[in-house]
């Protein structure tokens, strides 16, 4: 998320505290962070911690290959209430600009596009709602 590190931190906090086992954060330059736990639920502490971590380089395709079920949250996706969600799946969130054309072409082949409806949501709101839906399924 360009120039919105605060939103990224909120997304990570909401995802992990919502019960997600791991969060991949992939930046525009390909730097990727794998987060499986947090040192705190306070945004400032999480931000410092994230900045101190060493990123690794990978591709979206390599991450997708690790999962049987892949979902892309997009405004043009199928209504989430009609989808059969896999709690062990990979859920991909973009920012308000969306993903690159290349990434969306890859996801058109390898992911089910799902939507929370016509209302745009911040990614961290969407993460919290998705966590709620997945917990309700169990």
Curated annotation (Swiss-Prot):
Places the protein is found: Cytoplasm
GO molecular function terms attached to this record: S-adenosylmethionine-dependent methyltransferase activity; tRNA methyltransferase activity
EC number, as in UniProt: 2.1.1.257
Protein's name according to its UniProt entry: tRNA (pseudouridine(54)-N(1))-methyltransferase
Function: Specifically catalyzes the N1-methylation of pseudouridine at position 54 (Psi54) in tRNAs.
Class of the enzyme per the UniProt entry, highest EC level: transferase
Assembly and interaction partners: Homodimer.
Membrane-spanning segments: none
Residues reported in the UniProt entry to bind S-adenosyl-L-methionine: 73, 94
Keyword Transferase: yes
Protein family: Belongs to the methyltransferase superfamily. TrmY family.
Catalytic reaction annotation: pseudouridine(54) in tRNA + S-adenosyl-L-methionine = N(1)-methylpseudouridine(54) in tRNA + S-adenosyl-L-homocysteine + H(+)
UniProt keyword list: Cytoplasm, Methyltransferase, S-adenosyl-L-methionine, Transferase, tRNA processing
Chain coiled-coil ranges: none
Single GO cellular component term: cytoplasm
GO annotation terms (biological process): tRNA methylation
UniProt-listed Pfam families: Methyltrn_RNA_2 (PF04013)
